[in-house]
Structure formats: structure tokens, C-alpha cells
Regions:
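N-terminal [4Fe-4S]-dependent radical SAM core
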Residues: 1-12, 60, 387-394
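Canonical Radical SAM [4Fe-4S] cluster-binding loop centered on the CxxxCxxC motif
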Residues: 5-45, 415-419
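Extended hydrophobic secondary-structure segments that form protein cores and membrane-embedded regions
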Residues: 10-13, 65-71, 99-104, 240-243
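Cysteine-centered iron-sulfur cluster-binding motifs in ferredoxin-type domains/subunits
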Residues: 14-22, 72-75, 265, 323-325, ...
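Radical SAM/AdoMet-radical enzyme domain recognition
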Residues: 51-67, 76-200, 413
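Radical SAM enzyme [4Fe-4S]-AdoMet core and its adjacent flexible, acidic
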Residues: 141-149, 156, 160-265, 270-274, ...
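Accessory C-terminal segments flanking Radical SAM cores
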Residues: 244-360
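Radical SAM enzyme core and accessory elements
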Residues: 274-276, 285, 318-398, 409-433
Length: 433
């Protein structure tokens, strides 16, 4: 019996691992070694097979997402993406809606690119790690030179042409202690309304991670720092992927949002420029090669293969006993298997490197998540969380400890912006009516 058409996500890499930058923490640059002499450009037959098989497999979906990542996909040139639109027009079923997405470092984006992306309604993800000093710490070009100015120039072009975009920000050793500053920069300086905050975890050996990696506690505190700012001022206006996913889990949806925190995984695969399909973007390795979409089995058949189903189910089945009895398991689900290289207090292998941070964050947001959940269940807007925070803040003295548990005083931490707004209101009273 053929597999039933259904929704899954394909991260396609038309240039493979090839990129014009040399970001120090990038795990994918080394994958170039898997395909020596391949040319690192997706050929026409793979391009057409990918789009045709994806559209056919997701015939019942409200919208089909066609995702291009890298490496750096803009190295393919605009004509590749023009060809993408031509193929989609020919291969799509009547009425089938398609959303094209592009994840880019933005350094090659100019007005021609931006006009094309705007005209064809691409959703663009821009990789940026915060203000200049934080961004340039690891995100450098092949010559080791900083990239911040080039990223901002590309982003400015996207904004001039009205391209819908979101920010993908890694949380690493250089910015991990500055959550609110990073968030405020993305929100206020760049105008980002959609954000992904991705932790950098580079496993070295044993239970060690690289010096560039964020620690578990750092990541948890980073998320809390951002959440406390977001919850007071931006619910409903700014969307942070981790917070949306968390709320979905508090609503009882254990497969919603990020695959990292879903109960099982396996529905997000990686397609190389050659047509090789891998179990996951983080498992582009010969041991996890499912097959090639131009050599017999289709994309859907490979995604639905027993091997891939077992890969996804293992996320739940390999959870240590420590995780199974954890009070925040419903929201965490053990994190991504790639980072489960610690040993539990019981001596069992398979604890996630960021476990301490996940517990910090999920326990901290339990009450506000319940508030939003209850608001939504009563048919109200989650923005009511702002009022809940405001009521609590009104009872807080300026010298009280901040609610983010940073150890700083309220007036010097998340209360600083509120105090500033209050001072402006006093200095500028409303006119007489």
C-alpha cells in the first residue's frame, strides 16, 4: 500500500554546505567533505524531482512550504529561484497554495534580490546574532572579517521592498548573558516581529561542549530574560518560536511547534543538492542517509520508511528515567537527541546538555503559560498576560528583586523600561480636553 499524503518538512540545501561566510560555530561547513567534486549546485533533475514529489506528497495540506537553506542558498543566483516558481506553477495541483522560504545570511541581498523576493512573497529568515559586537564575535567571512554591516545592508534592502522576514539568532558564549539586550536590539533596532533563538551546542568528547557553546543555565536564564520583557510589552505583537511552542504544550499539543520539544520527531528531513535525503539536518551523515529521491523511492516513501519512523520514535523511547519522571517533561520531551550526551544523577546516559536550562525556563514560565492557556480557553486574547504582569508589577517596590530571578533589583532590571515610560508620562501630561 502506498504511503498516505501528509505534511512533513523538507530543508533543502541547493548549494549543499557551501557558504560565503565562515561562522565559527557552524556545524554544517564540514559536510562539504561528504560530496567531493560534486559542484555543490542542485542540478535540474533533482530540483524538479524535489518540487514535484513534495507537492504531490502534500496534496491535502492547506499550504505547502518549500524551504531553501544552506550553506548559503543565494549563491545559486536568482535564476534558480525563478526556475523554482516556473516548476511550481507547472507541478502544483489546481488551487494548491505554496509558501517559499529562504534562510540566508543576507550578505548577498541587494535591491534586485529584495525586489524579486517581495514580488514573489518569499518568507525570508535572516541570521543575525544581536548587536554588532555579539554578532561579529563568531559570524565572520572566509577572511575572518566581521559581517554585521553587510547583514544590515541586506536586511535594509529586504525592508525597503517590504519582504516579510524573521530573525534567526543563535545563543552562544558571546551573547548568552545578554538576553534582554539581544531581544531589544532585534525588536527595536531591527523591527523583528518573528524570532528564533537557537542554542549553540558543539559536542566535543565525553560530556564536554566547546567554549563557544552556551551552558544549560545560561540558556535558561537567557530565555527567562527575554520572556520577562516579552510578556510585559510584546505578547501578540512579537512572536518568539520558543514561547509559541511552549504555550502549545501547555495547551496539551505535544507535537506542536519545534521538533526539538515534540514528543517524537522524524517529520523534518534534510535534502542535499545531490538528491540525497537524510533523517534530519543535524544528522547529515552516511549512517542516516535514507536514499536518493531520483533513484527509485520518492520523497514521501523515504519519509514514511520504517527506518525513518524508527528514527523519530527513538526520541521518545530513549528518554532516561530521570526525564520520564520530570515535572516539565510535557514541555521539554528531552530536547534534541543530538545533544543528549550527559549522564543523569542515576548514572544513565542520554540526558540533554541543556537540561538545567530547560528546567529553569519551563518552571519559571509555568504560571504565565497557565494564564495564557486559560485566557485562550475562555475565548480571550493571550495579550491579557500583559495585564496580569502589570497587576503584579504595581505591587513591586523599586528595590525589590526582579521577577526574572537574576538577582538584580527590579528598578535596574525589567522594571527599568517601565520606570522610564512612567517618567515620560509624568513629564508629558495629556493636554486638557
Amino acid at each position: 500500500m502506498p504511503p498516505v499524503a501528509r505534511v512533513f518538512h523538507v530543508m533543502s540545501k541547493p548549494t549543499g554546505a557551501i557558504c560565503n561566510l565562515d561562522c565559527e560555530y557552524c556545524f554544517f561547513l564540514s559536510k562539504e567533505e561528504l560530496y567531493p567534486g560534486s559542484g555543490f549546485r542542485m542540478p535540474p533533475d533533482v530540483h524538479e524531482a524535489y518540487l514535484g514529489q513534495l507537492l504531490a506528497a502534500q496534496g491535502g495540506a492547506d499550504e505547502v512550504v518549500v524551504a531553501f537553506q544552506g550553506g548559503e542558498p543565494t549563491l545559486m543566483g536568482i535564476d534558480f529561484f525563478r526556475r523554482t516558481l516556473e516548476l511550481e506553477a507547472r507541478l502544483a495541483a489546481p488551487g494548491q497554495r505554496i509558501l517559499n522560504t529562504l534562510q540566508t545570511n543576507a550578505t548577498l541581498i541587494d535591491d534586485e534580490w529584495a525586489a524579486f523576493l517581495a514580488e514573489n512573497a518569499f518568507l525570508v529568515g535572516v541570521s543575525i546574532d544581536g548587536p554588532r559586537e555579539m554578532h561579529d564575535h563568531y559570524r565572520v567571512d572566509k577572511g575572518g572579517k566581521p559581517t554585521f554591516d553587510r547583514v544590515i545592508a541586506g536586511l535594509d534592502a529586504l525592508k525597503r521592498h517590504g519582504v516579510e522576514w524573521n530573525a534567526l539568532t543563535t545563543v552562544n558564549a558571546a551573547n548568552a548573558d545578554h538576553g534582554r539586550a539581544v531581544y531589544s536590539f532585534l525588536r527595536d533596532d531591527l523591527g523583528a516581529a518573528y524570532m528564533q533563538l537557537i542554542p549553540i551546542v558543539e559536542h566535543e568528547e565525553g560530556e564536554r561542549a566547546s567554549a563557544r557553546s552556551v551552558s544549560g543555565v545560561q540558556y535558561g536564564r537567557f530565555l527567562i530574560d527575554v520572556f520577562e520583557e516579552w510578556a510585559r510589552h510584546d505578547v501578540g505583537d512579537v512572536f518568539v518560536q520558543m514561547f509559541d511552542t511552549s504555550l502549545a504544550h501547555w495547551m496539551g499539543m505535544d507535537q506542536a511547534g519545534m521538533c526539538v520539544h515534540a514528543r517524537t520527531c522524524g517529520d523534518a528531513v534534510a535534502l542535499e543538492h545531490t538528491g540525497d535525503l537524510y533523517s534530519c539536518d543535524h544528522y547529515v551523515d552516511p549512517d542516516y542517509l535514507l536514499g536518493n529521491i531520483t533513484q527509485g523511492r520518492t520523497l514521501l516513501q523515504l519519509v514514511d520508511s520504517p527506518r525513518q519512523r524508527a528514527f523519530g520514535q527513538a526520541k521518545a523511547d530513549t528518554l532516561p528515567a530521570y526525564c520520564r519522571r520530570c515535572d516539565v517533561r510535557f514541555a521539554c520531551n528531552g530536547g534534541c537527541p543530538k545533544d543528549r550526551f550527559l549522564t543523569t544523577e542515576d548514572g544513565e546516559h542520554g540526558l540533554h546538555y541543556l537540561c538545567d536550562g530547560y528546567q529553569l525556563f519551563f518552571r519559571h514560565v509555568d504560571e504565565p503559560m497557565r494564564v495564557m492557556r486559560d485566557l485562550l480557553r475562555r475565548g480571550r486574547d493571550a495579550t491579557g498576560l500583559r495585564d496580569w504582569y502589570a497587576a503584579g508589577d504595581a505591587k513591586r517596590a523599586r528595590s525589590d528583586a526582579c521577577s526574572c530571578a537574576s538577582g538584580r533589583k527590579w528598578k535596574e532590571c525589567h522594571g527599568a523600561r517601565i520606570a522610564s515610560i512612567q517618567r515620560m508620562d509624568i513629564a508629558s501630561p495629556p493636554p486638557d480636553l
